[in-house]
């Protein structure tokens, strides 16, 4: 959302008001500082171990106060978080039109991911403007016969990535500062970057993931770098199974610029993150996704992503195949990224202002790929 906020700030025809709820506080503060954004409202609603229902009720009540005070003509929400669904519902209750950024992502299974799949479906039902990242997402929305206008824009996450990469590339001092945080990396060995935080993997799923990483670490010819999520459901099994392995580097979560630099230096990325599924292909990196289904089937069809699930054997087999074949890794640098060209935010602002614009040009390419809502682990698109 940050690139869109900056585009809105720069447009004299639109007055924008930024409200943050405090969900994912550590990451939020980093992004606000990086993009020089000062929220007009910071609700600071997150507390430890709160239930989703408790969070949603507090969000709706607090957001209702903001809407009553500001009386906006439109509310924009992003993605599939509880913040997004609660914001859309609060706006609906006040009959304020809603625009959904990153609309139309689907797995077809309400429990994968949970609760995100239901969150984004709810937001799309409420929205009268849906900014779909791809033609595949647009097709999902049309298949549901939703009444709102659907516009293919590309994803704003690619805007943020390109802005950040340009900053890193242009600033040698910044690169040196970022690399100084990664002095433990041995450039003579491939780097496996791991991120994992999905609720549906808590418990048995993370136990299997950690067992797979421990087995891969025994190869000795790979370095595993894992910025460990702050959630204790993640930290517990990760520390127990991987904390004492010499070629496994468990580090604190990085700020966005630092994480982009780490992705640039990675050889393979193993993740359950939706955003990383979009960002890493833009950097030419192989992505193995530790989920059984994805709402981003375009990447599977394009060959930039492979679903490996959370079974130990599947993870080990997929990572080993790439570690043992430099040529297979190199192929990813030549593949298409179907998620954006860095101009999604500009298209969204033009649509809001009523100015002419062209939809995401790669939409025709994505539409030609044989994908449906959600690709599962049995998909044959990956070559």
Task: Tell me what each language-model feature is.
Residues 1-226, 231-383:
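Nucleotide-activated sugar donor-binding and catalytic core shared by glycosyltransferases
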